[in-house]
């Protein structure tokens, strides 16, 4: 059972992270917050992964320096999928892999909403959120009129708040 759930977690994490990579700095920033949250909360359980986490965050920060709007360097599918894979692996290394939902909720909602919408339409012939563009960052930019910078900063703020709430919930378990 754990193997199947692990495969599902990896698939979801890879795809939602990839779907989030559409605005300069968004996916990298959100992944930086998520990896940092896992590192802070589960430092004792992650062991040597803490060093890898610091390397990932340092690399992401250097990347974000050049990826801020307007970007001079792009991550692409290879980078965003690798980040999603790594986040899934560190989530499974903890004693609470369900913590992925708490600590990566903005990634899940932004990227996952489109996956759910497509799945329901293609396989179940159910149309939901017809007036909502997916991924959600596109809806914020094109339907709500947010600039790229506003999208990135507002999503980062939401992710930081979600990580803090996740920390409180996980510490109560």
Give names to the regions the model predicted.
Residues 3-6, 10-173:
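Alpha-helical transmembrane segments
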């Amino acid at each position: 059972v754990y193997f199947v759930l692990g495969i599902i977690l990896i698939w979801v994490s890879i795809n939602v992270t990839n779907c989030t990579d559409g605005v300069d700095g968004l996916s990298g920033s959100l992944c930086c917050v998520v990896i940092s949250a896992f590192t802070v909360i589960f430092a004792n359980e992650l062991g040597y992964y803490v060093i890898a986490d610091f390397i990932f965050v340092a690399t992401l920060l250097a990347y974000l320096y050049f990826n801020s709007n307007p970007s001079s360097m792009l991550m692409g599918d290879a980078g965003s999928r690798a980040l999603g894979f790594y986040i899934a692996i560190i989530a499974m290394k903890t004693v609470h892999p369900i913590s992925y939902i708490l600590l990566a909720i903005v990634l899940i909602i932004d990227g996952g909403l489109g996956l759910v919408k497509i799945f329901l339409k293609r396989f179940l012939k159910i149309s939901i959120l017809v007036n909502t563009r997916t991924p959600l960052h596109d809806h914020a930019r094109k339907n709500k009129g947010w600039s790229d910078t506003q999208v990135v900063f507002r999503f980062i703020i939401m992710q930081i708040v979600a990580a803090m709430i996740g920390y409180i919930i996980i510490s109560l378990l």
